[in-house]
Design a protein with these regions (language model features):
Chain B
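Immediate post-signal peptide segment of exported/extracytoplasmic ligand-binding proteins
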Residues: 35-56, 77-78, 159-161, 214-222, ...
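Extracytoplasmic "Venus flytrap"/periplasmic binding protein-like
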Residues: 71-147, 164, 184, 294, ...
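Extracytoplasmic/periplasmic solute-binding protein
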Residues: 154-168, 172, 199-257, 300
Length: 310, 492
C-alpha cells in the first residue's frame, strides 16, 4: 500500500499522522516549562564539575599570579603524594571499623526496643539525641571528655585503677584512633538504630508468629525472616553511613586536627588543608575529582548490590 | 630720574618686605605643621572627606578586636565623622579571608591586620597596597622611625617597600617566680649541686638544670620547675627561636636545601621532649590558656609566653569584664621578667596594619591606620587592659603612665624593651604556612613519641618539596631577603 504524501512511517511500518501545529505548540510549551529546571540543574550540577576539571589542569594557588594550564602535573603529583594516599587509608580504616560497629550496635538496640517495653518512647527519644548534635560540637565535647586533666574518662579510669591517670587520648598514637572511633560511634549509632527500628517494625508479624509456632530458634527466625525483610533498609543505611564516614571531618578535626602528625588525617581534612589553608586550588581540584570518581564507583557498586538484594 | 630712582627703591623695599613676610609666614606654617602630630594630621586630612563614610577593617576576633570596637573605632568617628566597621576573624582564618576577598575583588575590606610573616605571600599576590606614597604625603616617616628597631627593621617592608605598620609588639618573654628563686634553702641546695647561683637561666642547659632541680625539690609542694605551652602551633614557634639561638640555620643559602634536620635541630627537639619530664603531666596538650592557668595558680616556677602573661600575672585590671576568663592570679608581685635563655626571643606572630589593594577608599583607610599607629594613639592603645596590643614603640617602654600600672610594670617594660632590640623573626617565605605546617606536624609527632631525627628528616623533605614547587630561585631570593634582616638570625 502506497503511503499517503506527507504521512510518516511508525516503527511498525504503519503510517503515523504528522504533528499538528497544535501538537508542536504543546510540545514546545512543555519544553519551555522544564527548560528553567534543566538550566538550573546544568548550572548547579554540570557547570561546577566542568569548571572543576578545567581548574585541575591549571596552576591556581591563590598566591601565585601565573595560573596558566600545566597539563597533567597535578595528576602526576596526586599519584606520588604519599600524604594523600595515607589520608585515604585512614578514611578507609575509620569506615572499616565504625560502619560494622554502628550497624551491629544499631541493630541490637533496635531489636531491644522493638518490644513494647515500659518507657520505650522516652528511651528512644534520649538515644536519638546524639544525632541532633552538630558533629563539630560533639567533637568539642568529646575533646573535653578525653581531656587529660579535667576529662571524666581519665577520672573514671583513675578510680577503677586506683591511681591518678593522665592518658593523652588525642596525642598518643595507640589511643587516638579509639578516641575518635568512640566519639564517632556514639554520635551515629542512633541513626542506624532509628532506621533499623523502623525497618523491624515493618516485618510481617504473622511470619514471626508462624516461625515461633513451628519451633524455629531466635537465630533461625532472625536469619531467615527478619534479615531478608530488613535487608534493603540495611543496605541503604550502610550506604548513607558509608558515604558519611568517607567525608568524616568534624569529629576528627575537633579532637586531633588530623594528628599526631598526619596519623588521623582523613581525605576530607587533607582536602580542606590543601584547598583552604594552603590554597593549592588546582591540586585540590584534582583531589576532588579523584574523590568524585572513587565515590561514584562505590555508590554505583553499592546500588547494584541493593538492586540485587531486591 | 631721581623720582624714578626713588620709586624703584621704594618698590624694591616693598618687594623685600613682602618676600620677608612671606618667608616668615611660610616658616611659621611649616613649624606649626611639623609640630602637629601624625595623629592630628591624619584626623585633619580625614575630616575633609570622611563624613558619612565607613571604613571596614579586618581584626583578630576576641580580645584584640575590643580595641577598635570599644576604643579606637568610636574615637575615630568622634574625631572625623568616619564610621569604622570591624570584621572579626579568628587568627587561623585571617589569611584565607583576606586572600578570598582580594581574589573575589569585592573591595569589602579597606584596612587589614596582617601577621608580618604573611607579607611576602600577600604582596606577591598583590593584596596589599604599597604605603610609601601615603607615608610621604601624610608626613609619617619620622614617626615610623620611632618604632622599636626589631619591629621597624623586620616587620614593615617587603622588597624595600612599606606594606604594613608594625602595630603589636608580640614577643616571647621569660617569666619566673622571684619568690622561689630568692628562697635561701633552694639557693644553697642549687649552688651545692650545680656550682652556680640560682638565677633566671641564660642558656637552655641552665634552664634544664634549674627546671629539673625545682621540680625535684618543689613537687611535694605542688610546684613544677616550669611549664610551657606545648601545643604544636606554639611549640613550633619556640622551636624556631631555640633552633636559631643554638646556632641552627633553616636553609643552605646557596642550594636552598633545608638544613633544619641538622644535629642542632635534632638536639633541640630531643631536649624539648626531655624537658616535659619536669613539667606538669599532660603539658603536651597545654595551649595559651592551660599554661596561663597553671602559672597564675602558682604551680610552675618558670614559663615563656607573650607579653599579656606579665599583665595577667600582675593582676592588672583583673576586674575588667572582658578579662573575666583569666584565672585569678595568685602570684601578683612575685613575678620576674627576663629574656628567654639565649637572649633572642621569638617575635611570635604579631600584627601589622595594612591597606587592602582592592579597597575603594584607600586614602581614608590609610589615614585611619596612620592615626592608630601614631605615637599619640598607639601609646593609649597598648595600655588598654583588654585589647592584647603590646608595646612596640620606643616611647611605650618608657611611658610614665604605663610604668605606674602596677609595682613591677617598670621591670616588665624594661624586659620588653630589651626584647625589642634582639628579637628573632618568624620564618617568612612564599607559602610560609606550608613550612610552618610541616614543623607543626613534626612537633605533634614528637609528643607522640617519634624519633627526633626521623621527624626532622621528614620536615626537611617537606620543606624541600615545597621549595621545589614554589621554584628554588624564586624562594631563594625571598629567603635571602629575609635572612638579610637584622632579626633573622642572632648576631655571632
Amino acid at each position: 500500500m502506497s503511503q499517503r504524501p506527507g504521512a510518516l512511517a511508525g516503527s511498525d511500518g504503519a503510517a503515523v499522522a504528522p504533528p499538528t501545529r497544535r501538537g508542536v505548540r504543546t510540545r514546545g510549551f512543555r519544553l519551555a516549562l522544564v527548560a528553567p529546571a534543566i538550566f538550573v540543574l546544568l548550572l548547579v550540577g554540570v557547570f561546577p564539575l566542568v569548571y572543576l576539571i578545567v581548574v585541575s589542569f591549571q596552576n591556581i594557588t591563590m598566591t601565585d599570579v601565573d595560573t596558566g594550564f600545566q597539563g597533567l602535573l597535578n595528576y602526576r603529583l596526586l599519584a606520588t603524594d604519599g600524604r594523600l594516599w595515607e589520608a585515604l587509608l585512614h578514611t578507609l580504616i575509620f569506615i572499616a571499623i565504625a560502619l560494622p560497629v554502628e550497624l551491629i550496635f544499631g541493630l541490637a538496640m533496635a531489636q531491644l526496643f522493638i518490644e513494647r517495653i515500659p518507657g520505650r518512647a522516652v528511651f528512644v527519644a534520649l538515644l536519638v539525641l546524639p544525632v541532633l548534635v552538630s558533629p563539630i560540637v560533639a567533637g568539642a565535647n568529646w575533646s573535653l571528655m578525653f581531656d587529660n586533666r579535667f576529662g571524666p574518662i581519665n577520672q573514671i579510669i583513675g578510680w577503677l585503677a586506683g591511681q591518678e591517670t593522665a592518658l593523652l587520648w588525642t596525642i598518643r598514637p595507640t589511643l587516638v584512633y579509639p578516641a575518635i572511633l568512640v566519639a564517632e560511634i556514639w554520635q551515629w549509632t542512633p541513626f542506624m538504630f532509628l532506621l533499623l527500628l523502623a525497618a523491624l517494625s515493618g516485618v510481617d508479624r504473622s511470619q514471626l508468629e508462624a516461625a515461633a509456632i513451628d519451633g524455629a530458634s531466635w537465630w533461625r527466625t532472625f536469619r531467615k525472616i527478619v534479615l531478608p525483610a530488613i535487608w534493603p533498609v540495611i543496605a541503604v543505611a550502610v550506604l548513607i553511613r558509608g558515604l558519611d564516614l568517607f567525608r568524616l571531618f568534624d569529629i576528627v578535626w575537633a579532637l586531633t586536627r588530623g594528628g599526631p602528625g598526619t596519623m588521623t588525617e582523613t581525605i576530607s581534612i587533607f582536602t580542606y588543608v590543601k584547598g583552604f589553608q594552603q590554597f593549592e586550588t588546582s591540586y585540590t581540584a584534582a583531589v576532588a575529582l579523584l574523590i568524585i570518581v572513587l565515590l561514584s564507583a562505590a555508590v554505583f557498586w553499592a546500588l547494584k548490590r541493593v538492586e540485587l538484594a531486591r | 630720574m631721581f623720582q624714578a630712582q626713588s620709586r624703584r627703591s621704594a618698590g624694591e623695599a616693598l618687594r623685600r618686605t613682602l618676600v620677608a613676610a612671606l618667608t616668615v609666614s611660610s616658616l611659621a606654617w611649616a613649624t606649626a605643621a611639623s609640630a602637629q602630630s601624625a595623629a592630628q594630621r591624619a584626623v585633619d586630612a580625614a575630616k575633609k572627606s570622611c563624613a558619612g563614610k565607613t571604613i571596614t577593617i579586618v581584626w583578630e576576633a576576641g580580645l584584640q578586636s575590643l580595641d577598635p570596637l570599644n576604643f579606637s573605632g568610636p574615637k575615630w568617628e568622634q574625631l572625623t565623622g568616619c564610621k569604622v566597621k570591624v570584621v572579626e576573624v579568628p587568627t587561623a582564618e585571617m589569611f584565607t579571608k583576606i586572600m578570598q576577598e582580594y581574589r573575589a575583588g569585592t573591595g569589602a575590606y579597606d584596612a587589614l591586620n596582617v601577621v608580618p610573616a604573611w607579607m611576602p605571600d600577600l604582596v606577591q599576590a598583590g593584596a596589599l597596597e604599597n604605603l610609601d606614597p601615603y607615608v610621604d604625603k601624610n608626613g609619617f616617616r619620622a614617626e615610623l622611625q620611632k618604632i622599636a628597631p626589631t619591629y621597624r627593621d623586620n616587620q614593615m617592608m617587603v622588597n624595600g617597600k612599606i606594606y604594613g605598620f608594625p602595630d603589636d609588639g608580640d614577643v616571647f618573654l621569660f617569666y619566673y617566680r622571684k619568690d622561689i628563686f630568692a628562697r635561701p634553702d633552694l639557693q644553697k641546695a642549687f649552688k651545692a649541686k650545680y656550682n652556680y647561683d640560682l638565677a633566671p637561666p641564660k642558656t637552655w642547659k641552665q634552664f634544664d638544670e634549674i627546671g629539673s632541680f625545682l621540680t625535684e625539690t618543689l613537687k611535694s609542694e605542688g610546684i613544677y620547675g616550669a611549664s610551657f605551652f606545648r601545643e604544636p602551633p606554639y611549640a613550633m614557634l619556640m622551636f624556631q627561636e631555640r633552633f636559631r639561638v643554638e646556632g641552627g640555620r633553616f636553609f643552605d643559602p646557596q642550594s636552598m636545601k633545608a638544613t633544619v634536620n641538622s644535629p642542632v635541630g635534632v638536639r633541640v627537639l630531643t631536649e624539648m621532649r626531655n624537658e616535659n619530664r619536669f613539667m606538669p603531666p599532660g603539658v603536651e596538650k597545654f595551649g595559651f590558656v592551660e599554661n596561663l592557668a597553671v602559672f597564675l595558680d602558682g604551680k610552675s616556677a618558670m614559663t615563656i609566653s607573650w607579653p599579656p602573661y606579665g599583665r595577667f600575672a600582675a593582676g592588672y585590671l583583673s576586674e575588667e569584664k572582658a578579662l573575666s576568663w583569666v584565672p585569678k592570679s595568685k602570684i601578683a608581685g612575685k613575678v620576674g621578667y627576663a629574656l628567654p635563655p639565649g637572649g633572642h626571643p621569638e617575635l611570635a606572630l604579631g600584627f601589622a596594619l595594612s591597606v587592602a589593594s582592592s579597597s575603594k577608599q584607600k586614602d581614608l583607610a590609610y589615614l585611619f591606620i596612620q592615626w592608630l599607629n601614631s605615637e599619640e594613639i598607639s601609646s593609649q592603645r597598648v595600655q588598654l587592659p583588654y585589647a592584647l596590643r603590646d608595646p612596640f614603640r620606643d616611647s611605650h617602654y618608657t611611658n610614665k603612665d604605663y610604668m605606674a600600672k602596677w609595682p613591677d610594670a617598670k621591670d616588665y617594660l624594661a624586659a620588653l624593651g630589651q626584647a625589642a632590640q634582639t628579637g628573632l623573626l618568624d620564618l617568612s617565605l612564599i607559602q610560609t604556612d606550608k613550612y610552618d605546617e610541616a614543623l607543626r606536624q613534626g612537633i605533634s609527632k614528637l609528643w607522640a613519641g617519634g624519633d627526633p631525627k626521623a621527624i626532622l628528616d621528614d620536615v626537611a623533605k617537606q620543606w624541600d618539596d615545597t621549595t621545589q614547587r614554589v621554584g628554588v630561585d624564586k624562594q631563594k631570593a625571598v629567603y635571602s631577603a629575609w635572612a638579610a634582616k637584622s632579626g633573622a638570625y642572632p648576631k655571632k
